[in-house]
Design a protein with these regions (language model features):
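Aromatic-rich, lipid-facing transmembrane alpha helices and their immediate juxtamembrane interface loops
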Residues: 1-172
Length: 172
């Protein structure tokens, strides 16, 4: 079932899980809790977009792990490069910087994390996503739509508030 409804929930679920991953990774490395997201809420939209793109484009390759992995490396790297570049150009800030990593491209992407994202996306497509999609499918459609409205509204409000706040800071 590839529907807007399903992909909206996939986006929100993986945006939240990505935020959890980022916060935990940072906390383990620094001993500090820091909201690692672009937004104020507990979401990292790049993870949600990444999984939606990978699932849409690479599910047909699910049985060929090598092609799935290579496609995942390529798609997630292109997404991270594009988003990192766009965020810096639009808001004059970097949310990540791989400049000190070997084999980096402008500090936006690097080989180590491209390979990590490739492994992660491969595991998501093969192991995690089928369970998440089944979980979304268990929720009665009407209840899911009713719940999606305030979740989407909160996300959009957070996005607008964040963008306006950054724009205001950049004017100062």
């Amino acid at each position: 079932m590839h529907s807007f409804y399903l992909f909206l929930w996939i986006f929100f679920i993986y945006s939240f899980l990505g935020w959890c991953l980022e916060v935990c990774f940072f906390a383990l490395n620094t001993g500090k809790f820091v909201n690692r997201g672009f937004l104020n809420g507990p979401v990292c939209p790049i993870y949600g977009f990444g999984v939606v793109i990978v699932v849409l484009c690479l599910t047909p390759l699910m049985e060929n792990t090598l092609l799935l992995f290579l496609g995942s490396v390529l798609l997630t790297s292109l997404l991270e490069l594009g988003v990192g570049f766009a965020l810096e150009k639009l808001f004059h800030q970097r949310w990540w910087d791989y400049t000190n990593e070997p084999f980096n491209l402008g500090g936006y992407i690097c080989l180590r994390f491209s390979l990590i994202w490739g492994v992660g996306a491969t595991l998501v497509v093969k192991l995690i996503h089928p369970a998440i999609a089944a979980l979304v499918g268990v929720v009665p459609h009407t209840a899911g739509v009713v719940l999606a409205v305030p979740v989407t509204a909160l996300f959009v409000c957070d996005l607008v508030i964040t963008v306006l706040g950054i724009a205001h800071m950049n004017q100062d």
